[in-house]
Structure formats: C-alpha cells, structure tokens
Amino acid sequence: MNPKKFFIGLMSGTSVDSIDAVALQFGRDEVNICGTCSYPIPTAVKTSIFSLSEQNEISIELLCKTDTQLGELFSQAAIELMLSCSIKPQQIAAIGSHGQTIRHAPPGQHQIPYSKQIGDPNIIAARTGCMVVADFRRADIAHGGQGAPLVPAFHEQIFRHRHRHRAIINIGGIAN
C-alpha cells in the first residue's frame, strides 16, 4: 500500500510577524492537518521587507539579500515543522511557498499588472530536499487572474455543499 504523501504550505502575511507553516494530507473529501508552526521573522529582516514594500525606489542589493534571507527562514520553518511532526523529506509530495509579497498590482488597477514575492524557493528546495512550488501570484496574473489563485480553489473544495449555500469572507490581511 502506498501511504499518502504530506504537503507543506508556507506563507507570511502583510504584518510580517512570522512565517506560518502547515503540514497536510489530502484525501478525496478530507483534509488532515498533521501539524502547524509559526516561525518568527527577525526584526532586521522585517525592516528590510517594509523598506522594500513601502519605498518607491529600492536597492537591488537589498532585494536580493532579503530574498535569500527569507528563503533561509522559510526553509527553517519547513524543517522545524517536519521535525515536530516526524515527517521525513521523502514523505513530502511538495512544499508550497507563497513567499512574502512586497509589491502587488493586479490587472484592472494598473496599466501593467505585476506582483513580486520574495523568499527564494530554490533555497527552500536545497535545504529541505523537497520539491517546492512557488510564485503562485505571478502565474495567476499571467493567466489573466488577480494574483490570488489558491484561496478560491481551497474554499470551493472545502466548503462546497450540494444543498447549502455558503459565503466565505476573505479580506486579505484582515479577516481570512
């Protein structure tokens, strides 16, 4: 029998307080949460993130260094979660890393839509030994979306019901 593989999800929000990590297994009609953790983001890295997010002119060097630092932090969060759940890298189907959004300009609001997340997924893959899937927002924008592809698909899968109507509130960074 082939045991179900685990998936790890990593993200940090607009508050930049921590990296949230979750280990999951998916069945046909169920999601099994195997473990979670919040991994703190050091103050110096937070300062860099806010600088990259808020200033019109940014340093390419700061962007590259912060991208690398966050890649290391996301890796550490994934490894900490794997250890706390006793999950080996070969049991992981994939790690999904949202990264840290520093700029987001979806279609319809800007002449040239774009989105930029940092937290190098190559570092996460190298440190964990797992396949990493990332850059969700830019892929969604490239296909004509608003750069938020995961939440609607997740909500539809988890909350759909043949006979009941449901409303889901997602006010990004405020009430997810």
Question: Where would I find each of the regions flagged by the language model?
Answer:
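Predominant activation on well-ordered alpha-helical scaffold segments within soluble catalytic domains
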Residues: 20, 71, 75, 79, ...
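Short glycine-rich, Thr/Ser-proximal phosphate-binding strand/loop in the N-terminal lobe
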Residues: 11-62
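Conserved active-site and cofactor/substrate-binding residues in soluble primary-metabolism enzymes
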Residues: 2, 16, 44, 65, ...
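Short beta-strand-loop/turn "lid" adjacent to the catalytic site in phosphate-handling enzymes
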Residues: 60-119
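Phosphate-binding/catalytic loop of phosphoryl-transfer enzymes
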Residues: 2-6, 110-115, 123-126, 130-176
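Short glycine-aspartate micro-motif
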Residues: 7-11, 92-96, 166-170
